[in-house]
A protein has these predicted regions:
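PRPP-associated nucleotide enzymes
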Residues: 1-168
Length: 168
């Protein structure tokens, strides 16, 4: 299974990077990252804390509005914490650029970005993932947590959504 191989690679990098010097805060960006984050955490050997944040920039479309809104904020203080942001896809970079700055202003000691999918061709903000699973082309992908209008998240694989589905 290609995802299992990805987990092994990401976890070995993560586990090596963080070793056992501290307990990082794994911070999932809802809703898209929840499946990836759960699988990553189940396979990890790291002792870590868990937190979630929900943001919105897509509403029901396929193109980011460019305006990031926090819809569910952090429930704990992150001052001095090493944050590992777990994201489903790094696309335009608007969301992760916003979040990385937001966490630093909240007092995070460091922010590391781990993403399942990376779409560098769409980047509009100067942000790069510290760890990325797969680079994907400029197509709208769904499944394994990724959605279109809140649909397709539960697919056990990642697929390209046909344009006729979202062009209506």
């Amino acid at each position: 299974n290609i995802l299992q191989k990805l987990f092994v690679a990401l976890l070995s990098l993560c586990d090596f990077a963080f070793l056992s010097f501290f307990v990082p805060l794994f911070l999932g960006v809802l809703k898209g990252s929840f499946i990836f984050m759960a699988d990553l955490m189940r396979a990890s050997q790291l002792m870590c804390d868990v937190e979630f944040i929900a943001v919105s920039s897509y509403q029901n479309g396929t193109v980011s509005s460019g305006r990031v809104q926090i819809t569910h904020d952090l429930q704990q203080d992150i001052t001095g914490r090493d944050i590992v942001v777990i994201e489903d896809i790094l696309d335009s970079g608007n969301t992760l650029y916003f979040l990385k700055n937001y966490f630093m202003t909240k007092g995070a000691a460091s922010v590391t970005v781990v993403t399942l999918l990376d779409k560098p061709s769409r980047r509009t903000k100067p942000i790069v993932a510290d760890l990325a699973g797969f680079e994907v082309p400029d197509e709208f992908v769904v499944g394994y947590g990724l959605d279109y209008a809140q649909k397709y998240r539960n697919m056990p694989y990642i697929g390209v959504l046909k344009p006729e589905v979202y062009s209506k």
